[in-house]
Amino acid sequence: MLDALHLFSFKCFEMLDLPLGKLTVLSGINGGGKSSVIQSLVLLAQTLDEREWSKSLLLNGPSLTLGSASDVINQTTGRRQLGLGASAGNRKVVWTFNAQDRRAMALDLSAVEVNGASLDLSGPIHWLLPEAEAGGCAIVQHLKCISWLSAERTGPRELLPLLDPQHHRQVGMRGELAAGLLHWRESDAVSERLLIEGEPPTLFHQVRARMRQFFPGCDLQILPIEGASAVSLRLRSSAKSEFQRPQNVGFGLTQLFPVLVEVLAASPGDVVIVENPEVHLHPKAQQDIGELLALIASCGVQVIVETHSDHVLNGIRLAVKGRRSVEPAQVEIHFFSRDADGASRRLSPKIDADGRLDVWPDGFFDQFDQALAALL
């Protein structure tokens, strides 16, 4: 598990040491830094995946397109340098990257520190580390296992991609690969703690069962398209209706589907990042997805969720109070805001065994109370 994220001169952050838990909640104002936290992790994962033997940070790739050095280096302190790092157990790795100029589309690896000691970068570099170090580095392995589902998810589509099964490992940043992944892995076993009683313990049946929990009567089919590298997702909203194209059912079904596939398909040791799981879900379903994410985090999968929903937060709090999933010490909650000078600021409320938070910063999921007070 990744225990912390370390950033310097990256986007809005001059310096950030961010604790990560089995379940980490990122909240706060728009433009406060939540997305930058996620992008830093995805940026490292993208580089490790696409440039295994490279000495540069890949700013523009299949997962992220961030532009040039001037777009990612903090404009106040960064000049031509930034740092990205992570901790796991008793090990901390920080990578420093330099740009030849602020228009550069990639940043060169200039230094690597492990527990504060600089490593020799004169030899071959593998996964952003000297070759002898790379294979046994747990931090690198966790970063390589990141799965990211962004807030900009694919809407209803007639056809969805079906990749080679060896490369169809994730749902895709927009969820566009979820149906294909479920097709290839339909018979995979799901963790016993996640099973819905009375349903077969396979991924396909458990995704169907979870969909019915959120949308009673819902069912799904995945149909391979003959002669094409594609599948068709069919949905119905009740047992009495016919299976239909996704365009003809509630939008929330197609938005929740990739979330469920992503979290139920994850393996222990994976890092799952979900942005705005509440999109197009009614309040009860938003609370339920919070409880499910807490349950997923108790099964060895590290979950990082970015949300604007008090219902998602309350679902997590209820899961902690009900002792059905993660322990209070395994949950990290962060609230990002801006000070008068525009610098990013973070407050981190702590949750107790009853699901209560020790502090409630102004602007932290309090809009309902503020509106109610004004109405009264």
Over which residues does each language-model region extend?
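Pre-Walker A-like glycine/lysine-rich segment at the N-terminus of P-loop NTPase domains
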Residues: 1-49, 53-59
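Short, solvent-exposed loop/turn segments at secondary-structure junctions
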Residues: 10-12, 25, 32, 153-156, ...
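Phosphate-coordinating catalytic segments in nucleotide- and nucleic-acid-processing enzymes
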Residues: 47-256, 262, 267, 347-376
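C-terminal lobe/lid and adjacent interdomain/linker elements of RecA-like ASCE P-loop ATPase modules
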Residues: 76, 288-376
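Walker B catalytic motif
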Residues: 274-277
